[in-house]
Design a protein with these regions (language model features):
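A general structural signal for well-ordered alpha-helical segments in protein cores
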Residues: 3, 24, 53-54, 67, ...
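Conserved SAM/SAH cofactor-binding pocket of Class I
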Residues: 93-124
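Conserved AdoMet
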Residues: 29-104
């Protein structure tokens, strides 16, 4: 199976084409161990690893489980955080909020900031 075929699995399930492309690249990076550069340079992908990627894409298409839950982590402010169905996935908007909070803390010389019960702990 080729990468466009795996993308089609996701788009056929209703996932937007751009999102499907990004998600397949994430699956390839995580489950096959290839970087985005490897993919863009046309490096031949191992068939067995590609089969795992295909299985994970089918799981995503069937369950519509968030891609972060399938790969087991979410990126937040340049760091990776473990997530699963028991943890809220940090959103891009939260990064904006955290950047503003950091700015507020620095500008007002606050010594303590408190983050309680906000999910994955990425804000803390």
């Amino acid at each position: 199976m080729l990468i466009p075929d795996i993308v089609k699995i996701l788009t056929d399930s209703g996932i937007e084409p751009n999102e499907a492309n990004v998600e397949v690249k994430l699956l390839i990076e995580h489950f096959a161990g290839y970087s985005l550069v490897d993919i863009l340079m046309g490096k031949k992908l191992d068939e067995e690893k590609l089969k795992i990627v295909e299985e994970k894409a089918k799981l995503r298409a069937k369950t519509h489980q968030p891609i972060q839950h399938i790969i087991g982590f979410a990126d937040f402010m340049g760091e990776k955080f473990v997530v699963n169905s028991d943890v809220l996935i940090p959103r891009d908007e939260t990064e904006i909020l955290v950047r503003k909070a950091i700015e507020l803390i620095k500008n007002n010389n606050y010594k303590i900031a408190l983050d309680m019960c906000t999910g994955s702990g990425c804000i803390a």
